[in-house]
Amino acid sequence: MAGSSAEQAADYRSILSISDEAARVQALDQHLSTRSYIQGYSLSQADVDVFRQLSAPPADSRLFHVARWFRHIEALLGGPQGRDEPCRLQASKGRRVQPQWSPPAGTEPCRLRLYNSLTRNKDVFIPQDGKKVTWYCCGPTVYDASHMGHARSYISFDILRRVLRDYFQYDVFYCMNITDIDDKIIRRARQNYLFEQYREQKPPATQLLKDVRDAMKPFSVKLSETTDPDKRQMLERIQNSVKLATEPLEQAVRSSLSGEEVDSKVQVLLEEAKDLLSDWLDSTGGSEVTDNSIFSKLPKFWEEEFHKDMEALNVLPPDVLTRVSEYVPEIVNFVQKIVDNGYGYASNGSVYFDTAKFAASEKHSYGKLVPEAVGDQKALQEGEGDLSISADRLSEKRSPNDFALWKASKPGEPSWPCPWGKGRPGWHIECSAMAGTLLGASMDIHGGGFDLRFPHHDNELAQSEAYFENDCWVRYFLHTGHLTIAGCKMSKSLKNFITIKDALKKHSARQLRLAFLMHSWKDTLDYSSNTMESALQYEKFMNEFFLNVKDILRAPVDITGQFEKWEAEEVELNKNFYGKKTAVHEALCDNIDTRTVMEEMRALVSQCNLYMAARKAERRRPNRALLENIAMYLTHMLKIFGAIEEESPLGFPVGGPGTNLNLESTVMPYLQVLSEFREGVRKIAREKKVLEVLQLSDALRDDILPELGVRFEDHEGLPTVVKLVDRDTLLKEKEGKKRAEEEKRRKKEEAARKKQEQEAAKLAKMKIPPSEMFLSEVNKYSKFDENGLPTHDTEGKELSKGQAKKLKKLFEAQEKLYKEYLQMLQNGSLQ
């Protein structure tokens, strides 16, 4: 970079001050690497002064900048003989040289920052190996249907992954696990198995009623001991449902109803009491379940359902998927090394992590993510699992803060052989062993839900760093925010959740993703009707823009006509376009802030809409190339976010995901012909005043084409705009329009009715002679004068002058109304 002559002189003085010649030449080469000194370079006195300090160009080929510069200066001075002659900086007559060039200052490029739970700050993202990013994500524990809480994490991480890969161009290696060995799975598998066996035995009504009463006893104790209000409310709901189903069956048994009638009530009670009976059956017979296939059947089923849900949500599959059941040998080896390193100990066939020993080490820190939660026994016990917090298990630990690496299996639990006896992995060690096997001693990103920070992720960090004897197993820890349901806490254990399948019955995968994009990935998201309505409106807003641009691009024009002169409006819109692109980039660099990105994109579309509306009002064609560039950019961004399938060239695809046929390019030529034919027919019908043909034309637009997913938009004096829109969307629009028209008609009728009532009331008032208007108010007045004006109140007291004056005004007003009424009678204007 070339600076001013004064700056160059200062640089050269600094170089000349170096006493060692080799170091001086090296410094000169460094300086010259930032400047242009090719033919035509403008010679300065500082160049000459430094040149004269050198006897010859350097022999070292690595100092080629000095060598080229030396020969160039020598040539400008007229060869070797001119090196000691006075320097004439003015070029010889007729010879010109290029002026000195100054590069632009530029701006500091924006760097990606991610909110790192390890620091609770937005840290500059620096992968450990160039552009390669290693990423491990905690997957689901598969014992039930996937719900919107899962969607919150996996859609959010899918968006982050796509942005890192497709926008920032990182090479992302994404790993995810499936937890198919866990206390929840074991308990649920046993309960399902035992309940189905019980149902198949078809217990008589009297036996079922007895069993339900027996099951209710421990359930009632559990209810009385529950302090959490949400959990208590859930248990009370179960209790009430069981009672409501029990009473009809008891009545049926007492009344000796037919077997069919009793059986129907038995089935109702079985369904309502399933949770109650399952817990009771497990407590009495769970230890007798020994077939390992029972414990693998349940997670296999729900894992498959999970993958179907992720595909339906357009969530990319991981590069590697690990299952705990497939990594038991690696987990055993992982635990053994932790013990060998001095951070684990065996106790009664189980192995525990020694948190005190780990925390005392100068190399390690325990509780990196949530240090304030260390010692929280409730959270620690939840992390251990329901089957692992009995008094005998807790007594095996050296400290209550220690957690299980390996659990000795009890009767009724699956088991695998290991050096400490038959058992199964602890929850936290599963992720550590699988991630460590695939990603090694340190990964770039670890992701999971916010509620996994402690104890799960803190324990993962501890045991992994104990294994690798390092302090950097994870560089960036990302946690997605909670999801609430209409402001209420969502919990599978509280049975307060919406499954992904149920959510997809109401809204499309794109609409759900747009809702997530319109919120920060790390903050709480409220899944509610308001949230989804905002997403629907955003989708409609963007889609209308894409449809309008497509219509403009379909207008016939020759090749040269595609490139039109830019007026001030195009220049301004293009300036705004690039400004919004910069704003989008800055937002993505700022912790992948998709909420701001979506608003910037909305603002850009609003500017385009204003531009198109102005052109339409002026009967001028909008600039095709500019609008296409903007629409393609927006499409590109929505593709990156996973809101548009890859095959769509511009805007949202028509026909839904998985449609191989390019519906738009196939049917649009035919629709365009139909539109032009319809316009011609309408024109003739208007001229000939054939109302029936115009009505048929409107019916085609309003009733027939929407059923096929086609919208015709008529604009006075302009060609009909043809748009392909999702059929359901059009039918909803049609229904909404119908409701709006009905509401308008209802309001009009209501206004007419009110007006009629007001006129009737006014007429009724006008009919009253002023002399009679107060006579009926005996609850207010006791005496009246000859004109009917009150003089005394009900107690016989004479009215004050102020009261009398007020009544006099009312009397005179009524007198005027009554005269109008008499005049109307005389004129015959009353119907």
UniProtKB/Swiss-Prot annotation:
GO terms for biological process: cysteinyl-tRNA aminoacylation. GO terms for molecular function: ATP binding; cysteine-tRNA ligase activity; identical protein binding; metal ion binding; tRNA binding. It is found in: Cytoplasm. Its cofactor is Zn(2+). Residues 736-762 have a biased composition (Basic and acidic residues). It holds the Pfam family tRNA-synt_1e. GO terms for cellular component: cytoplasm; cytosol. A motif ('KIIK' region) lies at residues 184-187. A motif ('HIGH' region) lies at residues 140-150. It catalyses: tRNA(Cys) + L-cysteine + ATP = L-cysteinyl-tRNA(Cys) + AMP + diphosphate. Residues 736-766 are annotated as: Disordered. CDD domains: CysRS_core (cd00672), GST_C_CysRS_N (cd10310). It is an enzyme of class 6 (ligase). Its EC number is 6.1.1.16. InterPro entries: Cys-tRNA-ligase, Cys-tRNA/MSH_ligase, Glutathione-S-Trfase_C_sf, Rossmann-like_a/b/a_fold, tRNA-synt_1_cat_dom, tRNAsynth_Ia_anticodon-bd. The modification N-acetylalanine is found at residue 2. Keywords: Acetylation, Aminoacyl-tRNA synthetase, ATP-binding, Cytoplasm, Ligase, Metal-binding, Nucleotide-binding, Phosphoprotein, Protein biosynthesis, Zinc. Binds 1 zinc ion per subunit. Zn(2+) binds at residues 138, 431, 456, 460. ATP binds at residue 492. Homodimer. Catalyzes the ATP-dependent ligation of cysteine to tRNA(Cys). Belongs to the class-I aminoacyl-tRNA synthetase family. This is Cysteine--tRNA ligase, cytoplasmic.
